[in-house]
């Protein structure tokens, strides 16, 4: 179905958790980032389904996300 084709999967390591909320860091360019709240689905083989909060084509920080967050 069309719905299935639009599933966004991201590396689980890209997800930051604060209390009950899940976030990723979206790259805006020029070393600028935005913390984006997401809703996640199930995880498989190191990838997690994102149900809402991200669009196809968004660039997210995968490695060192914690460090990036702390440094800002």
Question: Model-predicted segments: where are they?
Answer:
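Hydrophobic alpha-helix/coiled-coil detector that fires on Leu/Ile/Phe-packed helical surfaces
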Residues: 1-6, 15-16, 26-32, 44, ...
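Exposed loop and linker-edge segments at protein-protein interfaces
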Residues: 9, 37, 47-72
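Short edge beta-strand segments in beta-sheet-rich domains
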Residues: 10, 19, 33-35
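ATP/adenylate-binding site constellation spanning eukaryotic-like Ser/Thr protein kinases
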Residues: 12, 21, 65
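Amphipathic alpha-helical segments that mediate coupling or scaffolding at interfaces
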Residues: 13, 27, 39-41, 71
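Residue-level recognition of beta-strand microenvironments
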Residues: 15-18, 40-43, 53
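Short aromatic-glycine-enriched beta-strand elements
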Residues: 21-23, 48
